[in-house]
């Protein structure tokens, strides 16, 4: 009676099977070398685990350290001012929150800004204060270093995303384009809400469900988008096409809204409402106020207006710089799955073009999207790749160093002089400062950290709709000499120090002589003076016998 064979793929019975088994049994008495093979499943799992460890401890950890080091260097090589908001809507507010003195601009009395972003730096200030380390230099540099670290994380996230979507070569060139972009270098360490919006946008894109992405997470990306909206409500413009695409492609639309978007939006908005309730003292939805003022009512025109095509003819080409031809080339080469990124760029430019007031920084968040196409272009260059890389690097290096170290540096350098007036002046108790420049030209108490009496020309907009409205700065520049004689009609009200641009000296020289002011310091500002802005900043000091009188008007 034949015993049944085990279930190993052979049929029971049959001569061939019996002979095969008999042959195997005979050979078992000799030395047989069996080849050991690991299962494909085991091999793939082990390979992925090793790759994951490499990404964490090998390539990516070194990449992160390199990027952090570069952005820290970036931070210290940007010593110029860009726009007033990098101080007046962040650091000045944070300083006022922690140290209870300073100045809040009209946007805060009108509740157009959220305290969420300044709270980040206020927390840093509070920790430094509790540790007794709140020196003026730390108050200036620690927030900027914090912003630099966040920008470094965003840079690495962009690299990781492109590595998932394409391959390491494409990711490398996108990363190169991102790091050598002069405008990114110029902005990414500044304490601007636009910078934070850009950082959050890049990290959110890492979790966004792009075709080919392995890091999709609706909760994470929607949380980051919601935070970007809380910090800068116009982030909704950039994210509208991306959110719409996700909604259209999601098969479980109701689940996406009820279990992802609504809970995330509710939690984030509630947190923002509570933060603003604490600091404003009343419930207010600043995001609605901001959009109503800047988008619906278009009050931003008070600070200047531009033609509708400005972003296409000037703004976008300038921030792209020498990346522009590579961006155009990459748009033709990139696969269809990147079409949504191009649509987002064009949509953002079109919507912002409808608003009269335009600035370069408003479209900064679309710049990383453009780097994807620039990197794709470099990947496919063969003959001209080395010259193209040299051209990109050197041209952007020049622009980055010039704008970061030279152009518009005087308004920061003069604050160092004011620090000396406060900390090194034996008569500091009687010192006072009057900044006679276009409003918000310089930082304020966040860069002095001393309750020194200071004043500047103010420029709040008229919200009542008056025609031919002139703010204090406008009235001053109509006739500076008459304004000074009228404002400081007696010696008791004169400040000890005047700060002004060089173009004003000749016009007010009679006042300076009659009031016994002497020029004591000169600071270079720009090679491109225009309008009310001069090439240099002058500091005048009034030196009289006896004690100074501090009855300066505020």
Curated annotation (Swiss-Prot):
Q: Which disease is it linked to?
A: Developmental and epileptic encephalopathy 80: A form of epileptic encephalopathy, a heterogeneous group of severe early-onset epilepsies characterized by refractory seizures, neurodevelopmental impairment, and poor prognosis. Development is normal prior to seizure onset, after which cognitive and motor delays become apparent. DEE80 is an autosomal recessive form characterized by onset of refractory seizures in the first year of life, severe global developmental delay and/or intellectual disability.
Impact after mutating residue 537 to M: In DEE80; uncertain significance
Q: Could you tell me what this protein is called?
A: GPI alpha-1,2-mannosyltransferase 3
Q: Some GO term, biological process aspect, for this entry: which one? A: GPI anchor biosynthetic process
Q: Which family does it belong to?
A: Belongs to the glycosyltransferase 22 family. PIGB subfamily.
Q: Which organism is the protein's source? A: Homo sapiens
Topology relative to the membrane: Multi-pass membrane protein
What gene name is given for the protein in this entry? PIGB
EC numbers, comma separated: 2.4.1.-
């Amino acid at each position: 009676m034949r015993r049944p064979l085990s279930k190993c793929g052979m049929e029971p019975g049959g001569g061939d099977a019996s002979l095969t088994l008999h042959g195997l049994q005979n050979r078992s008495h000799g030395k047989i070398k069996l080849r050991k093979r690991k299962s494909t499943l085991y091999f793939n799992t082990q390979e992925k685990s090793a790759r994951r460890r490499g990404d964490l401890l090998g390539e990516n950890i070194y990449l992160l350290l390199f990027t952090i080091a570069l952005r820290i260097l970036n931070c210290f090589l940007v010593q110029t001012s860009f726009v007033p908001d990098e101080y007046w809507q962040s650091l000045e507010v944070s300083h006022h929150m922690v140290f209870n003195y300073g100045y809040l601009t009209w946007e805060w009395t009108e509740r157009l800004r959220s305290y969420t972003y300044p709270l980040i730096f206020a927390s840093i200030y509070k920790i430094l204060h509790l540790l007794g380390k709140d020196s003026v230099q730390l108050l200036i540099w620690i927030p900027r270093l914090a912003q630099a670290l966040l920008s470094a994380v965003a840079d690495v996230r962009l690299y990781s995303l492109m590595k998932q979507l394409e391959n390491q070569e494409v990711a490398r060139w996108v990363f190169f384009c991102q790091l050598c972009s002069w405008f990114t270098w110029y902005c990414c360490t500044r304490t601007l809400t636009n910078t934070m919006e850009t950082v959050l946008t890049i990290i959110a894109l890492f979790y966004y469900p792009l075709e080919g992405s392995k890091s999709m997470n609706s909760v994470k990306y929607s949380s980051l988008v919601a935070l970007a909206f809380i910090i800068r409500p116009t982030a909704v413009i950039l994210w509208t096409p991306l959110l719409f695409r996700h909604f259209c492609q999601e098969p479980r639309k109701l689940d996406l809204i009820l279990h992802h978007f609504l809970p995330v939006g509710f939690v984030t908005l509630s947190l923002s409402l509570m933060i603003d309730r604490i600091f404003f003292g009343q419930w207010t939805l600043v995001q609605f106020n901001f959009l109503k003022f800047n988008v619906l009512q278009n009050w931003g025109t008070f600070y200047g207006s531009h033609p509708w095509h400005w972003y296409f003819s000037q703004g976008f080409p300038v921030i792209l710089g020498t990346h522009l031809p590579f961006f155009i080339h990459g748009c033709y080469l990139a696969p269809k799955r990147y079409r949504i990124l191009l649509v987002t760029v064009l949509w953002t430019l079109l919507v912002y073009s409808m608003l009269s007031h335009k600035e370069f920084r408003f479209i900064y968040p679309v710049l990383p999207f453009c780097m994807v196409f620039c990197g794709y272009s470099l990947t496919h260059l063969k003959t001209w790749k080395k010259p193209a890389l040299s051209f990109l690097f050197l041209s952007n290096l020049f622009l980055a160093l010039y704008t970061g170290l030279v152009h518009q540096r005087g308004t920061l350098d003069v604050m160092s002089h004011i620090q000396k007036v406060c900390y090194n002046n034996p008569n500091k108790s009687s010192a006072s400062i009057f900044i006679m420049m276009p409003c918000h030209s310089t930082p304020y108490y966040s860069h002095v950290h001393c309750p020194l009496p200071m004043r500047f020309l103010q420029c709040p907009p008229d919200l009542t709709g008056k025609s031919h409205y002139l703010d204090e700065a406008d009235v001053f520049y109509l006739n500076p000499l008459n304004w000074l004689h009228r404002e400081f009609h007696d010696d008791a009200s004169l400040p000890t120090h005047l700060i002004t641009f060089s173009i004003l000296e000749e016009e007010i020289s009679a006042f300076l002589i009659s009031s016994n002011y002497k020029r004591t310091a000169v600071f270079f500002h720009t090679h491109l003076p225009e309008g009310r802005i001069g090439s240099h900043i002058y500091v005048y000091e009034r030196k009289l016998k006896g004690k100074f009188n501090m009855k300066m008007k505020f």
